[in-house]
Amino acid sequence: MTSENPDVLLSRVINVVRAASSLASQDVDFYKNLDRGFSKDLKSKADKLADMANEIILSIDEHHESFELKEEDISDLWNNFGNIMDNLLEMSDHSLDKLNCAINSKSRGSDLQYLGEFSGKNFSPTKRVEKPQLKFKSPIDNSESHPFIPLLKEKPNALKPLSESLRLVDDDENNPSHYPHPYEYEIDHQEYSPEILQIREEIPSKSWDDSVPIWVDTSTELESMLEDLKNTKEIAVDLEHHDYRSYYGIVCLMQISTRERDYLVDTLKLRENLHILNEVFTNPSIVKVFHGAFMDIIWLQRDLGLYVVGLFDTYHASKAIGLPRHSLAYLLENFANFKTSKKYQLADWRIRPLSKPMTAYARADTHFLLNIYDQLRNKLIESNKLAGVLYESRNVAKRRFEYSKYRPLTPSSEVYSPIEKESPWKILMYQYNIPPEREVLVRELYQWRDLIARRDDESPRFVMPNQLLAALVAYTPTDVIGVVSLTNGVTEHVRQNAKLLANLIRDALRNIKNTNEEATPIPSSETKADGILLETISVPQIRDVMERFSVLCNSNISKSRAKPVTNSSILLGKILPREEHDIAYSKDGLPNKVKTEDIRIRAQNFKSALANLEDIIFEIEKPLVVPVKLEEIKTVDPASAPNHSPEIDNLDDLVVLKKKNIQKKQPAKEKGVTEKDAVDYSKIPNILSNKPGQNNRQQKKRRFDPSSSDSNGPRAAKKRRPAAKGKNLSFKR
């Protein structure tokens, strides 16, 4: 295919898309009904497109059903076809990416090398391993009775003496008492090797197949390796860690590679002797290359007492360069043409001897790392980004381990603790959607699990997985059978402590119930008409109100019983030499003394003046009472009273079918008697309050509201009875 063909194909595809879009915007059915020829052409084109779609689908799957064009399901049909085409295009892109990767690997002059596949007959992931902690000379202490003490016995390459570096720092607002990082001053003030600042030719790694790793598990082999490391300028280091059968975790294996050799160090067997490697690890003239040393630095100082000065972290280098991914597997594949496998990343590295695939996997982590370091260093120097990577590497090297009990109150990247949250069980509540009212039960189970894990040096998830803890909170079994038969994943620790856990759950539920009852508010007696409470008060609030009320009552009683102040005493007689007097001011503004006797005289004069006052009688006008004239009740003679008994019809009378409605005249009223209608003045409008022109306005007619409570609709128009046609007839029966 020439370079011009893709452009021609693209232009044709664009024209097809434009034509289809313009056709879709028209009323095709309307034109089909108008023109028979257009309808035939359109149907033939649609059938041709359906045949092409069926050919494409049948070429992928011979058993796939063919598409049939039907107007009722054409949208679903083409949606399915579009999904199939999307999958085909994605597969094409994936194949093109593979082809480009193959071309790039060939252009580099070497094929991609793979980690060997092994049968794994001598590796059993389910095999029970004896806990190596039982053989340690220094027993594991998980009590956290004191801050973490560095395991340094001596301090090589020191700028500050060991005694000064291991002084306990007093607690402050954010940090409890702790021991500082013993090599923090050296990491900040010692310079890197001058060779790391220069662009140098890349040194290729030794052949993978021609070299064999050296296993180090004795003191003699350790000292021999140490002498070899002292004569190097760069070393690559990595660790394998296990944290499932240990509370804090243990370092199981250390991989160290030089330009010539690969070492695999048994850190379980040489745990007490590896501190001598500080002579190399703290030497700033030897570059220590790690990848992602974020946790490796913590594990080295916690288990082995090792610290790193002169760290180069390839993880931060890959980020500074701007690589799409920053994993070690990506660096191995793109910079060393080596395809590793993460199959054994989470394997149990405590087993001895190591299987062949585990040995190969551990060796691959550091075998190519120095060559990758050469390539990344040159790229960083060319882009002027090396200083930033060294700064980040220093910060990683200054990280220190601290027990959870003595962690800083404010989380910091410089300090690592196994538990960094104040209430870690709340994370489980969020993950498993546990209601807040069961937080007490979650906390009790979490603390019990943590206590057992510390005692037996097991991980909390080994004692009781999070799923099992959430199930206990959800189902709350309160007997042994309920705890044991809760799920299939009941651990040995839970099975052995089933009775204790059942009692713990029962007590926690009782505490939750009591807490809820105490926190339930007592409603007041004041309620609205619809039953809604106006106010709610709790028991402590009632007690507070009662105490305040009693204080007020006592204070009022004491005030009422208080005697007035006098100028004499029962025992000593009259104390004050002068009489009591008040002060009055004259018109001139000068004060004059007013004695008590004067006040008494004034009071007597006031009383006598009140007695001489005449009583004034106010007459209240009574409303005018109009006498009501009652009509005289006339007695009627029973003889002259009309008879209302039904009369018997006479058969000889005439029956009139229609009769004129002639109203009888009312008898004239007696002269001299005038009858007036009563007037209701409350309904008469006030003339003075009316606005001008208001009476001229027409009143609005009352409209019928169908949604009102009054269900009576407007009355229909009154119909007139049709007049009888013909003559009026009368006949005899």
UniProtKB/Swiss-Prot annotation:
The lineage of its organism: Eukaryota, Fungi, Dikarya, Ascomycota, Saccharomycotina. GO terms for biological process: exonucleolytic trimming to generate mature 3'-end of 5.8S rRNA from tricistronic rRNA transcript (SSU-rRNA, 5.8S rRNA, LSU-rRNA); histone mRNA catabolic process; nuclear mRNA surveillance; nuclear polyadenylation-dependent antisense transcript catabolic process; nuclear polyadenylation-dependent CUT catabolic process; nuclear polyadenylation-dependent mRNA catabolic process; nuclear polyadenylation-dependent rRNA catabolic process; nuclear polyadenylation-dependent snoRNA catabolic process. Residues 214-380 form the 3'-5' exonuclease domain. It comes from Saccharomyces cerevisiae (strain ATCC 204508 / S288c) (Baker's yeast). Pfam families: DNA_pol_A_exo1, HRDC, PMC2NT. Residues 667-680 have a biased composition (Basic and acidic residues). UMP binds at E240, H241, W299, K342, Q345. Residues 687-697 have a biased composition (Polar residues). Its EC number is 3.1.13.-. This is Exosome complex exonuclease RRP6.
